[in-house]
Amino acid sequence: MNYAYPDEKGHYGIYGGRYVPETLMQSVLELEEAYKEAMEDEAFQKELNHYLKTYVGRETPLYYAENMTKYCGGAKIYLKREDLNHTGAHKINNTIGQALLAVRMGKKKVVAETGAGQHGVATATVCALLGLECVIFMGEEDVRRQKLNVFRMELLGAKVESVAAGSGTLKDAVNEALRYWVSHVHDTHYIMGSVLGPHPFPQIVRDFQSVIGKETKKQYEALEGKLPEAVVACIGGGSNAMGMFYPFVHDEEVALYGVEAAGKGVHTEQHAATLTKGSVGVLHGSMMYLLQNEEGQIQEAHSISAGLDYPGVGPEHSLLKDIGRVSYHSITDDEALEAFQLLTKKEGIIPALESSHAVAYALKLAAQMKKDEGLVICLSGRGDKDVESIKRYMEEV
């Protein structure tokens, strides 16, 4: 399979690109230049690997979930344990890389957006480590859902700005963070949290996250002497999935499955299943599949999980859907909750609600596969942050 994206203009087929105001174009080009140089600099790579190993705690284990495997009665189920990273999710793979890049570019301050608060915490964490000032924009609704993470960010020295505009969720936080970046661009780096935004952000985030898939490949081959038959990851903006899928894209014998949030059901208005129900448009500087109405107004995304309710999806996922290399599915709030409880009770591992969507789909898939086949789930984060809201949800039900 001939797959070489993005092209030099930052396009993934028709997707991606740089739809930014003139005021940002210079910074985006400067970032691309700095990133290319850093990637070719052995000293930068060495420093990054040092922090990934000694600070983040990589490599993360590839765990054979024997009880889940027996329960499904099909393929062997493995979990790539991104929940065991420092800060409890995959997000820090990207924030540590981008923060080192910010230091290299001579920036003193970092701005970021956050939904569930995981990216905010991971950003505040690396800013504390590297002595950078940190401003985090978070939707008002998410601030309410994720009080603990807000307190964590403040403990780490970040300034958290609550965004009341729009629906008070991730999309609105991104708008405000971009606005802030435009007016502080001389001394501030924007750490985008997912494979979104104008080029080179989707590529930078993918590259820093692809440590997940590279490790998985090596670990699975060491354990089973072959590659897995299937790999499953959840998708909001799509960074954990892109990090897991990218190293497997050329291995066509490995089936790749992305799992979106179906919320209350894709037949309702309350879901975040962009690739299932969306159409092509431009949001936050990039062309991608979006949830929008006929007038092109962005629709609200809904999911029980704060990290999946983004109304768009990364440009590279948009391309991978079109060329059929990844197949995309969706899981409802209720199915994700069921999978959350099942994994917790069967394996003693409390997954994030985001990751629970991947677990739910993987269970259906594993049951249809043969016993000598293998399936890997990207367990993108731990569920501590969700326990409180799950308790509320279960009490209401």
Swiss-Prot record:
SUPFAM superfamilies: Tryptophan synthase beta subunit-like PLP-dependent enzymes. One of its GO terms (molecular function) is tryptophan synthase activity. Its EC number is 4.2.1.20. GO terms for cellular component: cytoplasm. Its cofactor is pyridoxal 5'-phosphate. Keywords: Amino-acid biosynthesis, Aromatic amino acid biosynthesis, Lyase, Pyridoxal phosphate, Tryptophan biosynthesis. CDD domains: Trp-synth_B (cd06446). The keyword Amino-acid biosynthesis applies. Gene3D superfamilies: 3.40.50.1100. It catalyses: (1S,2R)-1-C-(indol-3-yl)glycerol 3-phosphate + L-serine = D-glyceraldehyde 3-phosphate + L-tryptophan + H2O. The keyword Lyase applies. Pfam families: PALP (PF00291). The modification N6-(pyridoxal phosphate)lysine is found at K91. It is an enzyme of class 4 (lyase). Pathway: Amino-acid biosynthesis; L-tryptophan biosynthesis; L-tryptophan from chorismate: step 5/5. The beta subunit is responsible for the synthesis of L-tryptophan from indole and L-serine. HAMAP family: Trp_synth_beta. Belongs to the TrpB family. Tetramer of two alpha and two beta chains. This is Tryptophan synthase beta chain. The gene is trpB.
